[in-house]
Amino acid sequence: MTEARHQVNFITGNANKLSEVKAILEPAISVTNQSLDLVEIQGTLEEVTIDKCRRAAELVGGPVLVEDTCLCFDALQDLPGPYIKWFLGSIGHEGLNNMLLAYEDKGAKAVCTFGYSAGPGHEPILFQGITHGKIVPARGPSNFGWDPIFEYEGKTYAEMDKAEKNKISHRSRALAKLQEWFAKEMTA
């Protein structure tokens, strides 16, 4: 078994996100977890992630990894964007589809931004991954956010098994950049 060279404290209360992050990063990077109730500012995805990362590092008093995800509809100039969690909670999968009824363009992008901070006072470093797809009526299990309505190459995220999704998702693309950064830090 490969021993982890790095450890990150992933700040999330979302068990599905934690499971995906562990599946992608381990064993190369050991993932511990802490759930903190962090206030989220309004702003761009990058601003939200940087602020969340700084707050988490201060609360924990050490290194942290945070994540923010958005779903951007091409026809709506990237809305709902970083507010997807609130849109989904208010109007559900059907409501999100209804937002695009007047538009031919159902294109969307899933964007995941991780922020890593070495601790309080350290500037967060961002790692972003994007997957382009489209919005479709819900298909597959509905136990993980908007996965049933985001289609990539003929399958919704919800229709994919975990290994398949973890190869192509916005989250896996962002984490690949994090892994690359950690590898460079080891040789620096």
Swiss-Prot record:
The prosthetic group or cofactor this protein requires is:
Mg(2+); Mn(2+)
Task: Name the InterPro entries for this protein.
Answer: ITPase (IPR027502), ITPase-like_fam (IPR029001), RdgB/HAM1 (IPR002637)
Pfam families xrefs = Ham1p_like (PF01725)
CDD domains recorded: HAM1
Name the positions where ITP binds. 12-17, 52, 68-69, 85, 144-147, 165, 170-171
Is Plastid one of the keywords? no
Keywords, comma-separated and alphabetical: Cytoplasm, Hydrolase, Magnesium, Manganese, Metal-binding, Nucleotide metabolism, Nucleotide-binding, Nucleus
The cellular location(s) given in this protein's UniProt record come to: Cytoplasm; Nucleus
User: Where's it mainly located?
Assistant: cytoplasm
Cellular component terms (Gene Ontology): cytoplasm; nucleus
**Origin superkingdom:** Eukaryota
Coiled-coil ranges (or none): none
Q: Which residues bind Mg(2+)?
A: 40
Stated EC number for the protein is 3.6.1.66
Per the annotation, how and in what number is the cofactor bound? Binds 1 divalent metal cation per subunit; can use either Mg(2+) or Mn(2+).
Q: Which reaction does it catalyse?
A: ITP + H2O = IMP + diphosphate + H(+); dITP + H2O = dIMP + diphosphate + H(+); XTP + H2O = XMP + diphosphate + H(+)
EC main class here is hydrolase
GO terms for biological process, alphabetical: deoxyribonucleoside triphosphate catabolic process; nucleotide metabolic process
Task: Please give the Gene Ontology molecular function terms for this protein.
Answer: dITP diphosphatase activity; ITP diphosphatase activity; metal ion binding; nucleotide binding; XTP diphosphatase activity
Q: Which NCBIfam families match?
A: RdgB/HAM1 family non-canonical purine NTP pyrophosphatase (TIGR00042)
* Family as reported in the entry's similarity comment: Belongs to the HAM1 NTPase family.
- PANTHER family per UniProt: INOSINE TRIPHOSPHATE PYROPHOSPHATASE, INOSINE TRIPHOSPHATE PYROPHOSPHATASE/HAM1 PROTEIN
What job does this protein perform? Pyrophosphatase that hydrolyzes non-canonical purine nucleotides such as inosine triphosphate (ITP), deoxyinosine triphosphate (dITP) or xanthosine 5'-triphosphate (XTP) to their respective monophosphate derivatives. The enzyme does not distinguish between the deoxy- and ribose forms. Probably excludes non-canonical purines from RNA and DNA precursor pools, thus preventing their incorporation into RNA and DNA and avoiding chromosomal lesions.
**Binding partners and assembly:** Homodimer.
Provide the protein name: Inosine triphosphate pyrophosphatase
Species assigned in the record: Podospora anserina (strain S / ATCC MYA-4624 / DSM 980 / FGSC 10383)
Highest classification ranks of the organism: Eukaryota, Fungi, Dikarya, Ascomycota, Pezizomycotina
